[in-house]
Amino acid sequence: MATYDLSKVTVKSVQTGDILNCPYSGAYKKVTLPPGKYLFEVWGAQGGYRSSESYGGRGGYAVGTLVTFSGADAYLYAGGSGNTGKTSGGFNGGGRRATYNGGGGGSDIRINSTSLYARIIVAGGGGSDGGSTKSGGYGGGASGAAGTDGYGTGAGAGTATAGGDGGGTFGSGGAGVAQSSGYGGGGGGGWYGGGGATPDSSGDDDKGGGGGSGYVYTSSSASSYPSGCLLNSSLYLTEASMKAGNASITSPTGTSETGHSGNGYCRITVLEVLDAGKGLPLYVKKNGVWLQATSASIKTNSLWNLLE
């Protein structure tokens, strides 16, 4: 049982109890998972800000459990904060902006491919602020939040099925616009990105960008995956939940925070590596979801015998 930092080491094999941490590095990290049971967690990155950390939209959080009998290659994308990405926006989908810092990137884990259509779990990034007091929207969660302050257009929230008004797309936040001495924030990345903001043209009016949405691939959410999905029912996550960036969550370091601040983060906890020779644990598929059996029996000579 060991704890690894995937931004510093390459893990060649895993064991039950291992923790695979993936802080932001500006690039994805790959790890090969043998057949087993795994807990996936992702924290979205915070949107950029100019004068106060409180104005950058906070990132969301998502968690789910995967049971795989064939093993899988996992690609971990920890989003970059808007302040890390500067005007280009945070790594992994943060929306750019013409001046100041862009939107925060979403954080996600992809299975067997680096395609956006292989994302199995996503936490939305927050939108960047428009000006010194014009806040960006928080990331999702099932939905992000719109940029709430200032005057102008765009800055819509990413949702479960669409990008936010202002150029949010599948995986990326929209760009913030500067005009007439006003500044619009960039949208946060995520399942669907938040919209970038365009301030009105009446003067020095600023507006924050929208937050991106989150997603977990489950038996109930799979139907909302857009055309081109590279996942299948054997990869449904269970025990899944999401929290938006305005909710109380546990940070990667174990402290309590309201939404995630700073750069994004991914974590895989190895709950169990399956041993084909052990017999138990056994899993049964019910309504498309793999569940662990608490006991099992085999019929021999017309008699049922409990497996030990």
Task: Label each residue range with its predicted role.
Residues 136-183, 276-280, 287-308:
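Intrinsically disordered, low-complexity terminal/linker regions enriched in Pro/Ser/Gly
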Residues 173-252:
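Aromatic sugar-binding interfaces of carbohydrate-active proteins
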